[in-house]
C-alpha cells in the first residue's frame, strides 16, 4: 500500500477513538503504514531506570494507521463540519507528478 501522506500535512482522524481531531503529521512510517500526528493518540511510556538516568513516565504520541487518516481541506467552524478529501495524483504540464485533492481537484 502506497502512503500518500507526507510530513507536515494537515490531517483529520476519520476513524477510531480520536475521530474528528485534526493535527499535523510529525513522522510517516512506510514499513508499517502508520503516521504519528502531533498531540493525537497520546500514550504513557514507562522508562526503566538505567545507569546514569532515572526512571520516568513519559507522554508521547503513538502511531495511527494511515487508513484512519484523511487530508484536511477546510477546518470545522461553528456552523459547518470539517471537510476532508482523499489524495490523488496527476501529471502537470512539465510531466511532473503532483498530489491533488480528489474532491476539489486542487494541487497540494
Swiss-Prot record:
The keyword rRNA-binding applies. The keyword Cell membrane does not apply. GO terms for cellular component: ribonucleoprotein complex; ribosome. One of its GO terms (molecular function) is rRNA binding. InterPro entries: KOW (IPR005824), Rib_uL2_dom2 (IPR014722), Ribosomal_uL24 (IPR003256), Ribosomal_uL24_CS (IPR005825), Ribosomal_uL24_KOW (IPR041988), Translation_prot_SH3-like_sf (IPR008991). Belongs to the universal ribosomal protein uL24 family. One of two assembly initiator proteins, it binds directly to the 5'-end of the 23S rRNA, where it nucleates assembly of the 50S subunit. This is Large ribosomal subunit protein uL24. The gene is rplX.
Amino acid at each position: 500500500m502506497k502512503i500518500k501522506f507526507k510530513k507536515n500535512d494537515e490531517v483529520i482522524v476519520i476513524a477510531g477513538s480520536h475521530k474528528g481531531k485534526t493535527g499535523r503529521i510529525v513522522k510517516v512510517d512506510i514499513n508499517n503504514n502508520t503516521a504519528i500526528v502531533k498531540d493525537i493518540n497520546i500514550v504513557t511510556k514507562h522508562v526503566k531506570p538505567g545507569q546514569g538516568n532515572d526512571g520516568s513516565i513519559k507522554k508521547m504520541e503513538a502511531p495511527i494507521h494511515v487508513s484512519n487518516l484523511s487530508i484536511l481541506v477546510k477546518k470545522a467552524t461553528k456552523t459547518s463540519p470539517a471537510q476532508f478529501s482523499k489524495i490523488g495524483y496527476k501529471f502537470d504540464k512539465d510531466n511532473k507528478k503532483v498530489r491533488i485533492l480528489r474532491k476539489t481537484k486542487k494541487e497540494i
